[in-house]
A protein has these predicted regions:
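N-terminal subdomain of nucleotide-sugar transferases
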Residues: 1-68
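A donor-sugar binding/catalytic signature common to diverse glycosyltransferases
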Residues: 21, 317-386
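Short, polar loop motifs at secondary-structure junctions
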Residues: 36-39, 46-48, 150-153, 220-225, ...
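Conserved nucleotide-sugar phosphate-binding/catalytic loop shared by glycosyltransferases and other
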Residues: 39-110
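A nucleotide-sugar donor-handling region in carbohydrate enzymes
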Residues: 41-43, 190-268, 299-300
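Conserved nucleotide-sugar donor-interacting segment of glycosyltransferase catalytic cores
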Residues: 98-106, 110-197
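Donor-nucleotide binding loops and adjacent catalytic segments primarily
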Residues: 236-331
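C-terminal amphipathic helix plus adjacent low-complexity
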Residues: 407-454
Length: 454
């Protein structure tokens, strides 16, 4: 059968989908990854070489439309300011939706400030040529099945317009379903439905729950990390993939001391262009003198701000795939993204998740020169969720560099590396919430049946 995969054109959104593409292609199906052509973004979040990232994985890429700025940066569009998140709107909805608890506010903030912004960027009120071309490709190629991720639901419109079966594929906790259900339960128009309406109408597609949430949802989120929603999902094992590269020779050598990885996210460093929080200097000072070997995946921007010299036990590398690094590690220090945390979980590596009590909100103000951004915190939007998930199960710890001293951070590192109870908890968590779920390859027959039934 023909399978079309669509996603927001950034590595962090594509990489989680690669194992599905491999499984389907290995079963003899024709798989294409279809996405907008890249365009340089002031925030750095869009990959201008996205098609190359796709083909590096061994999957055929289809780039659609001319390079076009995100709606939020399209100053030639008089309505571009309407796409921007703003404080008045978010607080109005927080009150209307009765979002009170800290964990619920975190869910709302990720949905409103990031997920719905991504959706609005590619589905503004005015049609976009790149998105129209994706729909046109689907109508012409006639896929049997479309896989799409929640930050790029125009894949669902392409599926409906072409008559294909379609499956929503989660790449992070299900904030869109949680928020959509919250709106519906309060009798309010769904923000997700409103964002989808212009594109759906443009292509003659009805906005309903199936369009918004898929005919089915593949869910790689461990049971203990899932958000409270009523949307049924099909559990699937998350298989980490983080790009193609040549394996470094030093990775083949057995570490002489416990190896600790520090990984703070490729998307985060693309956006932040450095470290304004003091987190990196605190981590490097804490590991200095410990009897460990540290591999820090930090680039020159992240090191140049506040780091004069690296400790003797630290090797800084711009990039190394976690799938190659983690099997050699005794601990992983990370920023709390789902992909990084589950990569660590898949190798039963004890973890320390960097998290603070700050909110994660992003506001934009239109100016004559473009957009002036105000970001309350550079932390990962759901780092509190992932940190608590690991800490509550004994497989890791939560690190708040704003409140914990260097001595406390150093003690935390020692415990995570040396305590066999933490390693045992990580092994148990791997078996119970990762290894027990079916792989993408095992779900191919189910996907084939779904596509056949339409």
């Amino acid at each position: 059968m023909r399978v079309m995969i669509t996603c927001f054109p950034a590595p962090a959104h594509f990489w989680p989908l690669v194992p599905y593409a491999w499984a389907l292609q290995s079963a003899g199906h024709d798989v294409r990854v279809v996405a907008p052509s890249g365009f340089p973004s002031p925030t750095g979040i869009i990959s201008t070489d996205f098609a190359q990232r796709v083909t590096e994985s061994g999957i055929a890429a289809v780039s659609c439309g001319p390079p076009t700025p995100l709606a939020v940066h399209d100053c030639d569009d008089p309505g571009f300011a309407d796409v921007l998140p703003n404080p008045d709107e978010t607080e109005r909805y927080v009150r209307a939706l009765s979002v009170h608890e800290r964990v619920e506010r975190d869910m709302w903030d990720v949905f409103y400030h990031y997920a719905i912004l991504a959706i609005r960027n590619y589905q503004p009120p005015r049609p976009r040529e790149d998105i129209d071309e994706i729909v046109a490709f689907a109508k012409d190629w006639r896929p049997d099945l479309v896989l799409w991720e929640p930050w790029f639901p125009c894949g669902a419109v392409a599926a409906k317009a072409s008559g294909a079966a379609h499956v929503r594929t989660l790449i992070s906790p299900d904030y869109t379903a949680w928020a959509h259900e919250r709106f519906v339960s309060r009798g309010l128009p769904s923000m997700l439905a409103e964002a989808m309406q212009p594109l759906a109408e443009h292509h003659g597609v009805t906005v309903d729950n199936e369009l918004l949430l898929g005919q089915a949802t593949l869910d790689p989120i461990p049971a203990g990390m899932r958000l409270p929603t009523r949307t049924p999902t099909v559990p699937v094992r998350y298989l980490p993939y983080s790009g193609a590269s040549v394996s470094e020779h030093w990775l083949r050598d057995e570490p002489q001391r416990p190896r600790v990885a520090i990984s703070l996210g490729v998307s985060a460093r693309a956006v932040d262009k450095g470290d304004s929080t003091g987190r990196i200097p605190a981590l490097l000072e804490a590991v200095d003198g410990l009897d460990v070997e540290v591999i820090a995946t930090l680039n020159k921007d992240q090191l140049s701000d506040q780091v004069e010299t690296l400790p003797d036990n630290v090797r800084a590398v711009d990039y190394v795939p976690l799938s190659q690094l983690l099997p050699t590690c005794s601990a992983l220090v990370n920023h709390g993204s789902f992909g990084t945390v589950i990569a660590g979980l898949s190798h039963a590596v004890p973890q320390i998740v960097c998290d603070t009590d700050e909110p994660t909100r992003l506001f934009g103000r239109a100016t004559p020169d473009g957009v002036e951004w105000d970001r309350t915190s550079p932390k990962q939007g759901y780092s509190t969720l992932t940190a608590n998930y690991l800490a509550d199960r004994g497989a890791g710890s939560r690190l708040d560099h704003q409140k914990q001293s260097i001595s406390e951070i150093r003690s935390m590192l020692r415990r995570v590396v040396e305590d066999p109870g933490v390693r045992d908890a990580a092994l148990r968590l791997r078996e119970e919430e990762w290894a027990s779920t079916p792989t993408p390859a095992q779900l191919v027959p189910w996907l084939e049946k779904l596509a056949q039934e339409g």
